[in-house]
């Protein structure tokens, strides 16, 4: 899906790591939400409350998922799942565009 229809976008950005990571929240009529974001090159760690599916739209990253010891390389068109109440590491090699879907 390359676009979303009939949604509400929260105007204020979610900004992390001194502006190197930012996203916008997209709210859907069914109560679900996603964030669309941009990651600048660097290494970051994020915590989750809800389970997430991170879809890479552009760029190259390595991710270290909870319970894993080996980094996984991903690029545009690939995705990874993160369990609720966990942390994951992400090493952004090139500017990365992503869509994060939150799973209840």
Swiss-Prot record:
GO cellular component: cytosol
Catalytic reaction(s) noted: a purine D-ribonucleoside + phosphate = a purine nucleobase + alpha-D-ribose 1-phosphate; adenosine + phosphate = alpha-D-ribose 1-phosphate + adenine; cytidine + phosphate = cytosine + alpha-D-ribose 1-phosphate; guanosine + phosphate = alpha-D-ribose 1-phosphate + guanine
Keyword Acyltransferase attributed: no
Record flagged with keyword Transferase: yes
Keywords: Glycosyltransferase, Transferase
EC number: 2.4.2.1, 2.4.2.2
MF annotations from Gene Ontology: guanosine phosphorylase activity; purine-nucleoside phosphorylase activity; thymidine phosphorylase activity; uridine phosphorylase activity
EC category: transferase
InterPro entries recorded: Ppnp (IPR009664), RmlC-like_jellyroll (IPR014710), RmlC_Cupin_sf (IPR011051)
Matching HAMAP family: Nucleos_phosphorylase_PpnP (MF_01537)
Family: Belongs to the nucleoside phosphorylase PpnP family.
Function according to Swiss-Prot or TrEMBL: Catalyzes the phosphorolysis of diverse nucleosides, yielding D-ribose 1-phosphate and the respective free bases. Can use uridine, adenosine, guanosine, cytidine, thymidine, inosine and xanthosine as substrates. Also catalyzes the reverse reactions.
This protein's name: Pyrimidine/purine nucleoside phosphorylase
Taxonomic lineage: Bacteria, Pseudomonadati, Pseudomonadota, Gammaproteobacteria, Thiotrichales
């Amino acid at each position: 899906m390359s676009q979303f229809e009939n949604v509400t976008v929260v105007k204020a950005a979610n900004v992390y790591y001194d502006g190197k990571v930012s996203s916008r929240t997209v709210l859907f009529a069914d109560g679900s939400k996603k964030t669309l974001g941009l990651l600048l090159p660097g290494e970051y760690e994020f915590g989750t409350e809800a389970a997430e599916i991170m879809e890479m739209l552009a760029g190259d990253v390595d991710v270290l998922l909870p319970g894993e010891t080996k980094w996984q390389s991903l690029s545009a068109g690939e995705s990874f799942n993160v369990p609720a109440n966990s942390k994951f590491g992400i090493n952004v090699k090139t500017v990365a565009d992503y869509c994060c879907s939150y799973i209840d």
